A protein has these predicted regions:
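Acidic (Asp/Glu-rich) sequence patches and key acidic residues
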Residues: 1-217, 224, 238
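C-terminal or internal capping secondary-structure element at the end of a domain, subdomain, or sheet
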Residues: 228-238
Length: 238
């Protein structure tokens, strides 16, 4: 399961943070809808049965409806026999907390670190220490430079080709890593923006192109935000 950051912008005269996030709750039940047709589910069952004799035997004498019920756990069907779901297709979280793992992520112009503040009070100056650390990370992971005395190889989940494809250069990587950004953004009108879906264990399903576009354009959310809006960092779990 995954934790990730969301910057929620609220207007004092608009919806609250809780109201903005509610439509994206995994626990929100929606009007029954066809997620997959009965043919799609049965095709999936048949593919698995081709390579599993025990499974094939278990399903051999079941009706199509019984197969679908057993396979999906669904007990709602439309008039054509398609399984119905009440799972929220816009689900983004099963629980969340303000700050959380990213407590005090926002730096104000007064030098304080907080979970929320007015947009006009944000200090968006790139972090010099993070910039230098990112440069060194690239040198060790992408350029395969030797470790210096006292250094340890940094933890890394990706191949060097991933960094080259997404960031192109060491300097661009360091610039992006040292500037403020979050995985997703929710605006006061309720729109949710993200580069891709968040999967298990913090792995984004977004491709390099969507990630690159997000990195390059994230600042537009801040530039276009009303200075008197409140920005809050939320730790979402899915």
């Amino acid at each position: 399961m995954s934790h990730y950051t969301v910057a929620v912008f609220t207007d004092s005269e608009g919806l609250s943070l809780e109201e903005l996030l509610e439509p994206y709750s995994e626990g929100l039940k929606v009007k029954p809808y066809v997620d997959r047709t009965k043919e799609e589910v049965l095709d999936e069952i048949n593919r698995y049965c081709e390579n599993d004799e025990e499974l094939k035997a278990n399903y051999e004498n079941l009706s199509d409806k019984e197969k679908i019920e057993d396979w999906t756990g669904c007990d709602l069907f439309d008039k054509d026999g398609n399984p119905l779901s009440t799972y929220n297709p816009n689900s983004k979280w099963d629980w969340y907390v303000v700050g959380g793992r990213w407590s005090n992520m926002l730096k104000t112009k007064d030098g304080e670190y907080v979970d929320e503040c007015l947009v006009k009070d944000l200090d968006l100056t790139p972090n010099e220490d993070e910039y230098n650390a990112a440069i060194r990370f690239w040198e060790l992971v992408v350029e395969d430079q030797p470790l210096k005395d006292g250094e340890e190889k940094p933890f890394n989940m990706y191949k060097k080709e991933y960094y080259i494809e997404r960031y192109s250069t060491k300097e661009n990587y360091a610039r992006i890593e040292s500037q403020f950004s979050t995985y997703a953004v929710v605006m006061p009108d309720g729109e949710w923006y993200e580069p891709g879906e968040m999967g298990w264990f913090g792995v984004s399903l977004a491709g390099p192109d969507s990630n690159r576009e997000w990195d390059e354009n994230y600042h537009k959310f801040l530039e276009e935000a009303d200075p008197n809006w409140i920005i809050t960092i939320v730790d979402c779990h899915i």
